[in-house]
Amino acid sequence: MRSGVIARKVGMTRVFTDAGEHVPVTVLQIDQCQVVAHRTTEKDGYVALQVGVGKAKVKNVSQAERGRFAVAKVEPKKKLAEFRVSEDALIPVGAEITADHFIPGQFVDVTGTSTGKGFAGGMKRWNFGGLRATHGVSISHRSIGSTGGRQDPGKTFKNKKMPGHLGVERVTTQNLKVVRTDPERGLILVEGAVPGVAGGWIQVRDSVKRKLPADVPLPGKFRENGSAGASQVEAAPEAPASEENA
């Protein structure tokens, strides 16, 4: 089980396949997603990675958090999240996870905060059918109708679906296909819509319901201390120096 990443939702666009068909995609951007800490079985009772993304102002970071970032030797991060991983998928602290951590064709689960829609009625919030258009109904066409019984039970139960605030909830969309990645610009293009507004934080992880492709990098693609990580492609050997003229 590999680590996920934190990305920022840029927006939607479309890309074209070799057959000329257009595919709607959501563009996600990774901005210096670094490993901040490890969670181990001996110390914490479980195995996980804490990753951070974005750059936070030092004045907005508490003294305790500054100490944690100093131990990890990373700059203060704006957004933190933990991802459960297996012991063989631990990435070194301070390493930066790149966009090619995911490969085209694999499926991912994305988690974000849904767009806020304010106070909504029962028809929009819960897909109620509303009342009739005619036959004595006036003004109340979109009302929810009765909310309780008669003398028994004589009350409206808790958690009854009623009008109220809609949106701003944690939403996970499963099995989105990775269409393309751009490691140089830190972009991940996934097919379809992703919850949340443009500029919102999105957690991206391997799909839990789809089989992981055999060629995905393990423990992942990352840069360690400004150089390529263990799973990255090794650098090409240097060309031999030319001989000087006599």
Curated annotation (Swiss-Prot):
Q: Which SUPFAM superfamilies match?
A: Translation proteins (SSF50447)
Q: Where is the composition biased (Low complexity)?
A: 234-246
InterPro entries linked: Ribosomal_uL3, Ribosomal_uL3_bac/org-type, Ribosomal_uL3_CS, Transl_B-barrel_sf
Name the GO cellular-component terms.
cytosolic large ribosomal subunit
Q: Which cysteines are joined by disulfide bonds?
A: none
- rRNA-binding among keywords: yes
Q: How is it modified after translation?
A: Methylated by PrmB.
Positions of post-translational N5-methylglutamine modification: Q151
* Any one Gene Ontology BP term: translation
Keywords recorded for this protein, A-Z: Methylation, Ribonucleoprotein, Ribosomal protein, RNA-binding, rRNA-binding
- The signal peptide here is none
Task: Extract the ranges annotated as region (Disordered).
Answer: 140-162, 215-246
Molecular function per GO: rRNA binding; structural constituent of ribosome
> Which family does the record assign?
Belongs to the universal ribosomal protein uL3 family.
What the entry lists under NCBIfam families is as follows: L3_bact
Q: How does it assemble?
A: Part of the 50S ribosomal subunit. Forms a cluster with proteins L14 and L19.
Please give the function described in this protein's UniProt entry. One of the primary rRNA binding proteins, it binds directly near the 3'-end of the 23S rRNA, where it nucleates assembly of the 50S subunit.
* Protein's name in the database: Large ribosomal subunit protein uL3
Q: Which gene encodes it?
A: rplC
